Amino acid sequence: MELIILVGIATALLVVIITLYLLQKKNAAPETKPAAALQRGVPQRVQEGVPRRAQIARNQRNRLRQNAPAAPAGQVAPAAGPPAAPGDSDHENEGQVDDDDARVPQGAVLDEKMGAKKRAKMEAKEQKRLQREQELHDREQRKVKEAKEEAERKHQEDLEAEVERKRVEAERLAKEERERKEHEEYLKMKAAFSVEEEGFEEGDADEQDSLLADFIQYIRDNKVVVLEDLAVAFKLKTQQVIDRIQELQADGTLTGVIDDRGKFIYVSEEELSAVAKFIKQRGRVSIAELAESSNNLINLTPISAGGEEASS
């Protein structure tokens, strides 16, 4: 009797357990079917938890806004575009993503599953960026080279200018030294002449008259005298000899002419009268005829030499 009761209780418990299991399974079936149907319409990337490209673009824009500096107070922020319609397709979002590609910061993490076209576009932009950097580098290198060449050229010009300056300075110093020596020699000569002149002028009147008579007789005897030799003979300066001859010509003591070779040619009064008589007799006389006749009318032989020839 007790065994039958125990079997009946066990059977009842088993039926209750099976019933509860079936009820639980029946309630869980309607929730599973809509979830399965929803997954059939969702792309695989969404099911795998990969964000959509529009979401990637929005995330990139958000990062750009966070990294971008705040706009100045006077600058007006660009107006936002009209809100997108709820029914816009993914193609519109993809176009917006393409427009924002230029603002993608360097080194931004990109989706590994982006399309081949977008990847090619990004690679082209990267290539252009590298090309621009290379051009800038080449330009900087060229500027550095040109600056170096300009500095070398300027240094060479400075060296040449310094050499030229030293050469001119050396020539100037040499000229000054030469002029200084000439001036010193001139002063020494002037001092010597001054001493000789003072000694001559401090003599008594008789000695001066004697020297003047000797001076006049020397010129008359030699007929043609070199002024420098005459100055040495009487211990005078050349200019003093010239001045004294001109004074003697002015008072009629001496007659003659000083040529351009530094010589004085003495012509006596008789010889001048003979030349004047010849010109008066001929009327018109050419220079050649006058020179030829003067050689015959004017005797330029020194008296001492003429006396020796006559005695011999």
From Swiss-Prot:
This is DDRGK domain-containing protein 1. Residues 59-162 are annotated as: Disordered. It comes from Drosophila yakuba. Belongs to the DDRGK1 family. GO terms for cellular component: endoplasmic reticulum membrane. One of its GO terms (molecular function) is ubiquitin-like protein ligase binding. GO terms for biological process: protein ufmylation. Substrate adapter for ufmylation, the covalent attachment of the ubiquitin-like modifier UFM1 to substrate proteins. Required for ufmylation of Atg9; protects the nervous system during aging, possibly by stabilizing Atg9 and supporting its function. Residues 59-79 have a biased composition (Low complexity). Keywords: Endoplasmic reticulum, Membrane, Transmembrane, Transmembrane helix, Ubl conjugation pathway. Residues 1-2 are lumenal. It is a single-pass membrane protein. It is found in: Endoplasmic reticulum membrane.
